[in-house]
Amino acid sequence: MEILFIRNNMNDNKNKKEIKKEYRNKKKELRKNYHNEKKELHLEYNEELDRYFEVQPNSNNNPPRRTVLEEIGNAVSHGSGVILAVVALVFMLKKVDSTIALVASLVYFSGLFILFTMSALYHSFSYGSKVKRLFRRFDYSSIYLLIGSTYAPIVLCYVGGKFGIIFFIVQWLIIITGITLIGVFGPNRLKYIHFPLYFILGWSAILFLPRMIREDLNLFLWILSGGIIYCLGMIPFLRDRKVSHFIWHIFVLLGAIVQWIGIYLYIL
């Protein structure tokens, strides 16, 4: 009887060891399966994300995916614009001879500086990050600022009077509205509003082009040339192929330089 009891105990201990061993093996197997499934899901998610951005790169407010070299070129190109904006400010401050010219020059510089800074920073951040999506809003908003600030010396110093002031106020009310829409809805959801507004604001100078042609043909040609360069830059921008965004940046730089030369030589 005692021998039977001992044998049963031994069998029980053996069963417990086997159960524990089986439990450990099962636990390892489950953990391994979990990690494998998690890895597969992660890969599937990334593949789905890649397909989404490949087919619909601009369908929502996520930035399009570009190569590292492209983004370096984009950041450096408009980073150089920041330096040029500071140099431009130094030249303008040396030339201005009135309070209104000083104010107009500072507004003009602010628009140039903000646009090139926001653009350079936006293209510096890694794809998929929240900060990149945030700076994309800043980047698109700064286009409005550039247009309005470029007009500041023209409407305040060249046009002047009641018409110049009213024009300046109305234009900036539209600009603030556009920036607010980008802030609330993002840069892509209302493109059918923003792109026409960019165009209308940019070419609103037609209201006083006859005066420019009659009194300052050289100023007219510089401003017109800059506007044409900006518009030509929209071709690679809208195509949105490899390196095309970098080409768009070069057009923006050239357009800004050309119009600055006209404003510096014939207005300030």
PLM segments and residue spans:
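Short, Lys/Arg-enriched N-terminal segments with co-localized hydrophobic residues
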Residues: M1-N9
